[in-house]
Every structure is written in structure tokens, then in C-alpha cells.
């Protein structure tokens, strides 16, 4: 019985952790999903963004007490503007999706929402981590050796 409980806890922790992409695996996935060059943004910039926002973790979340919003998923997309979590006051939900969709191992919906974000006037500058860690920097290291 103890073994079954322990096994259940281990499986639960794996399910909660989500998928943490390997760097080149994510680069290939983002390229396949059409992010390389989307709105003039290089694949290396998207990779830098994902590294600094979530460390390539699909289940990453970050609560923002100021506006009571939460950032979700590999791109840390915010519930105040882009998705609906049912808890953020005055949420816009411009991507027309549940925030939980941004936490899936299959990042297709997260990529579609990220594309929606960069269509706004701020573009990729909407992400603070991109401005702090990627803007005006050599970001080639994020795709180096990946063959993309």
C-alpha cells in the first residue's frame, strides 16, 4: 500500500511539473510552429525570451499582486490582457483562450497567443524579460548548434 501511495505521489509531481523543453528541441518546435521570422522577430530572440521568462518550462506561472494577474506558460503570457483564468479583475482575454491552455505540453496555443501579442504595437517589447535580457544583444547562443 505504501508503495502505491509513493508511486502516486511521484506520478503526480511529474504531471504538475509539466514539460521542460531541451533548448534545441524547443528551437525546432518554435520553428515548426512558424515563429522564426514572425513579424521580423528571429528564432533566437524567441528562444531568449522563453529562456528568461520560463526557463523553457510549459507549466511556469508567476502571480503579480499589483494587478492580481498571473503569467502563464513558456512565454509567461499575462491573464490581465491575453487569457482568461477566471480570477483576474478586468481581464481582456485578447487571445480568446483559457490561461490553462498556455500550460499544456503541446505549445501550439501558446505560440498562437504569442503571435497575437506581437501583432500589437509594442511587439516583442511587451515582454519585460526580453527587454532586460535579449534586446540589443547577441542572442545567437540560444539556437547555436541546433541546426535551425
From Swiss-Prot:
<feature type="active site">
    <location>
        <position position="71"/>
    </location>
</feature>
<feature type="domain" description="C-type lysozyme">
    <location>
        <begin position="19"/>
        <end position="148"/>
    </location>
</feature>
<dbReference type="InterPro" id="IPR019799">
    <property type="entry name" value="Glyco_hydro_22_CS"/>
</dbReference>
<keyword id="KW-1015">Disulfide bond</keyword>
<dbReference type="InterPro" id="IPR023346">
    <property type="entry name" value="Lysozyme-like_dom_sf"/>
</dbReference>
<dbReference type="InterPro" id="IPR001916">
    <property type="entry name" value="Glyco_hydro_22"/>
</dbReference>
<feature type="disulfide bond">
    <location>
        <begin position="83"/>
        <end position="99"/>
    </location>
</feature>
<keyword id="KW-0326">Glycosidase</keyword>
<keyword id="KW-0964">Secreted</keyword>
<dbReference type="GO" id="GO:0050829">
    <property type="term" value="P:defense response to Gram-negative bacterium"/>
</dbReference>
<dbReference type="Pfam" id="PF00062">
    <property type="entry name" value="Lys"/>
</dbReference>
<keyword id="KW-0081">Bacteriolytic enzyme</keyword>
<protein>
    <recommendedName>
        <fullName>Lysozyme C</fullName>
        <ecNumber>3.2.1.17</ecNumber>
    </recommendedName>
</protein>
<comment type="similarity">
    <text>Belongs to the glycosyl hydrolase 22 family.</text>
</comment>
<dbReference type="GO" id="GO:0003796">
    <property type="term" value="F:lysozyme activity"/>
</dbReference>
<feature type="disulfide bond">
    <location>
        <begin position="24"/>
        <end position="146"/>
    </location>
</feature>
<dbReference type="InterPro" id="IPR000974">
    <property type="entry name" value="Glyco_hydro_22_lys"/>
</dbReference>
<feature type="signal peptide">
    <location>
        <begin position="1"/>
        <end position="18"/>
    </location>
</feature>
<feature type="disulfide bond">
    <location>
        <begin position="95"/>
        <end position="113"/>
    </location>
</feature>
<keyword id="KW-0732">Signal</keyword>
<feature type="disulfide bond">
    <location>
        <begin position="48"/>
        <end position="134"/>
    </location>
</feature>
<keyword id="KW-0378">Hydrolase</keyword>
<comment type="function">
    <text>Lysozymes have primarily a bacteriolytic function; those in tissues and body fluids are associated with the monocyte-macrophage system and enhance the activity of immunoagents.</text>
</comment>
<dbReference type="GO" id="GO:0005576">
    <property type="term" value="C:extracellular region"/>
</dbReference>
<dbReference type="GO" id="GO:0031640">
    <property type="term" value="P:killing of cells of another organism"/>
</dbReference>
<comment type="subunit">
    <text>Monomer.</text>
</comment>
<feature type="active site">
    <location>
        <position position="53"/>
    </location>
</feature>
<keyword id="KW-0929">Antimicrobial</keyword>
<dbReference type="GO" id="GO:0050830">
    <property type="term" value="P:defense response to Gram-positive bacterium"/>
</dbReference>
Amino acid at each position: 500500500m505504501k508503495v502505491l501511495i509513493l508511486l502516486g505521489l511521484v506520478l503526480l509531481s511529474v504531471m504538475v511539473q509539466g514539460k521542460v523543453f531541451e533548448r534545441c528541441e524547443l528551437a525546432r518546435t518554435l520553428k515548426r510552429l512558424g515563429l522564426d521570422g514572425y513579424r521580423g522577430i528571429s528564432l533566437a530572440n524567441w528562444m531568449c525570451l522563453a529562456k528568461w521568462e520560463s526557463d523553457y518550462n510549459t507549466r511556469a506561472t508567476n502571480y503579480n499582486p499589483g494587478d492580481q494577474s498571473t503569467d502563464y506558460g513558456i512565454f509567461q503570457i499575462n491573464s490581465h490582457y491575453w487569457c482568461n483564468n477566471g480570477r483576474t479583475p478586468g481581464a481582456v482575454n485578447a487571445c480568446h483562450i483559457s490561461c490553462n491552455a498556455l500550460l499544456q505540453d503541446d505549445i501550439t496555443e501558446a505560440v498562437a497567443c504569442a503571435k497575437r501579442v506581437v501583432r500589437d504595437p509594442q511587439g516583442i517589447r511587451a515582454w519585460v524579460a526580453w527587454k532586460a535580457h535579449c534586446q540589443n544583444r547577441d542572442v545567437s547562443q540560444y539556437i547555436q548548434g541546433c541546426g535551425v
